Amino acid sequence: MEDFVRQCFNPMIVELAEKTMKEYGEDPKIETNKFAAICTHLEVCFMYSDFHFIDERGESIIVESGDPNALLKHRFEIIEGRDRAMAWTVVNSICNTTGVDKPKFLPDLYDYKENRFTEIGVTRREVHIYYLEKANKIKSEETHIHIFSFTGEEMATKADYTLDEESRARIKTRLFTIRQEMASRGLWDSFRQSERGEETIEERFEITGTMRRLADQSLPPNFSSLENFRAYVDGFKPNGCIEGKLSQMSKEVNARIEPFLKTTPRPLRLPDGPPCSQRSKFLLMDALKLSIEDPSHEGEGIPLYDAIKCMKTFFGWREPNIIKPHEKGINPNYLLAWKQVLAELQDIENEDKIPKTKNMKKTSQLMWALGENMAPEKVDFEDCKDIDDLKQYHSDEPELRSLASWIQNEFNKACELTDSSWIELDEIGEDVAPIEHIASMRRNYFTAEVSHCRATEYIMKGVYINTALLNASCAAMDDFQLIPMISKCRTKEGRRRTNLYGFIVKGRSHLRNDTDVVNFVSMEFSLTDPRLEPHKWEKYCVLEIGEMLLRTAIGQVSRPMFLYVRTNGTSKIKMKWGMEMRRCLLQSLQQIESMIEAESSIKEKDMTKEFFENRSETWPIGESPKGVEEGSIGKVCRTLLAKSVFNSLYSSPQLEGFSAESRKLLLIVQALRDNLEPGTFDLEGLYGAIEECLINDPWVLLNASWFNSFLTHALR
């Protein structure tokens, strides 16, 4: 059959049919009858359109070899044979310019004379049966249907055959010729039956003996035999009478399926209230590093030694003072805590041998900041179960917060490139198989795009801090250990650099369960003045601790240096996941890989190299109020990585709930965009489930805002 198709049809038609089948994941060499059917249908569509024009008076005329200078317009726009995206673009354009309703399914042609879409059918069965199937599927009076058969019969909507007798006769003759050619090669019966689905191998295949008994034993309840079950499955229509199926499930279920249209969805309601505040475990875009290059000091690699060396690079220390107090805290204690850290670091330097770790003195300011002796005493339930009014500890509802612009700025900054490399190319052995070669090529390209990304810096910073804190929590349970916040990178010139962001002081950490909390005080350097966005720093007490000279285009300028101090807490399970933040690199690489795979399957070759090296091509990155944002493949890699990193940094029950529930609405909207006629019940219930997760979390609120932008542009 494949040879016949390639001999019988124009090469352009054969190529289009192959492309169409590949787009749907079908193989022309295997599904040869389908290959022949698609070629036949394409040829009929082209013949339907051939020689039909509209002259300058708007009249329909037939021109087979006329004056090339005549002002003629093709009567039919051919939609069949284009790839799906381009076909829908053509359909949308026609609808916008002519005002006709957009069809739910892709039609084959548009008739500019009659101003209507046309669906062409070619059948090996009775024309009226096929016509009814088409009409039931399309469910539109706007689209004209015209069916041809291989026996010379035809059927059209309202018996309106559109074309003149001679044009239709040409199509019927061609179909009859194809049928005769197939019959002479012994291909016709197989081709005819493949549409009707007559005797298939499965129906002739008898299951006997043990397999038959196993099949009968494996039936779902209420089915007496395999035939009984098969008949039910064959007659089952998955989209039919959902209401009826729901009512069979439970007497309480009473759902009416409502059609989901472009006008159905509303935007998510974001909460009102004061702007949301920063809640990450460490500073992100506002962090400041004290750095040493090519470290070679004694004890290099020991955090405390590295930290002291970094501190010595800065000479602008000043007497600290509070410039943005924490509203609920005892702010002088935060000031005293920083002074204590400075004093104890000075003490270390005065010693003959610097210790590897430093445990802070248990001063009143640190005991207050770390919540020492503040936890309510735990009492065994057995000792108090007889108390009449025993009740759970009452906690207030969280205060609603509104979206603030700082979180979008944080995200934008996380997508940017820094001047340092934060990850090395993994040293993995030689590739031994072709698939390994492709995998390492993809990994290398991806690493090159993200190694300098600020989100990658956040990963390495998060891994370091969580590892150090978990180690200290286990090794020094009763001590207030001082933990430097350190990261390592390479400069553009390839020199090693060690960075100090600040310090953590860990509280008591007898962590028995995964969720037991260890308190810590973080003290982080910054050049950001907290008075510019005070709402962002609600949970912080900010000190001014020095002046830093910065090189700018106009020379050196002096800027105040701040210390952001806050009490925070984490648990074993959170630290365990924090230590594994490198997984974010893997997740975003897999997302990029699925994009490469989709491209490669269409082109039938590995597209990794073209994907990363074609710098002129842009890709969709995300939605914004302006529309779909596009960027280079590197920008896509960095954006996907930043999203994954922020999901880790801002992980919360609100994010889990929002992601799970909003995904359902996203799938419904996607089905509508794919013209699948989705139906819903209790849509307001779904909105309620999504919106109850919009409370005060900055990352969730930003995602909800992005979701609203997506809804606006997806349903235009």
UniProtKB/Swiss-Prot annotation:
Record motif Nuclear localization signal 1 (NLS1), residues: 124-139
Record keyword Transferase present: no
EC assignment: 3.1.-.-
Cofactor note: Binds 2 manganese ions per subunit.
Molecular function terms from GO: endonuclease activity; metal ion binding; RNA binding
Post-translation changes: Phosphorylated on serines and threonines by host kinases, including human casein kinase II.
Chief location bin: host cell
Protein purpose: Plays an essential role in viral RNA transcription and replication by forming the heterotrimeric polymerase complex together with PB1 and PB2 subunits. The complex transcribes viral mRNAs by using a unique mechanism called cap-snatching. It consists in the hijacking and cleavage of host capped pre-mRNAs. These short capped RNAs are then used as primers for viral mRNAs. The PB2 subunit is responsible for the binding of the 5' cap of cellular pre-mRNAs which are subsequently cleaved after 10-13 nucleotides by the PA subunit that carries the endonuclease activity.
Name of this chain's protein: Polymerase acidic protein
Species this protein is from: Influenza A virus (strain A/Hong Kong/156/1997 H5N1 genotype Gs/Gd)
Top-level taxonomy: Viruses, Riboviria, Orthornavirae, Negarnaviricota, Polyploviricotina
